[in-house]
């Protein structure tokens, strides 16, 4: 497996985890667990920024 394929797999994993975190956050908001949700959303945002950076790098490599 080449580096590009590995980066895509890692990016897909992070995006999947982010989606799961957002679903959990939605449930916690319904239970008024605002501080927990805030921390989880900050972690999710960092993960998504990492994915965005990796995808930009991947795009640059494939051009």
Whereabouts are the PLM-identified features?
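Amphipathic alpha-helical coiled-coil segments
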Residues: 46-63
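Coiled-coil-like amphipathic alpha-helices with heptad-repeat character
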Residues: 1-3, 23, 41-44, 51
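N-terminal acidic leader/helix
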Residues: 1-32, 56-60
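Short, charged, amphipathic alpha-helical segments
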Residues: 9, 16, 35-46
């Amino acid at each position: 497996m080449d580096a590009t394929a590995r980066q895509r797999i890692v990016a897909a994993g992070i995006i999947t985890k982010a989606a799961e975190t957002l679903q959990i956050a939605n449930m916690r908001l319904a239970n008024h667990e605002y501080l927990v949700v805030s921390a989880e959303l900050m972690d999710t945002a960092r993960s998504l920024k990492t994915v965005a950076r990796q995808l930009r790098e991947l795009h640059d490599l494939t051009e």
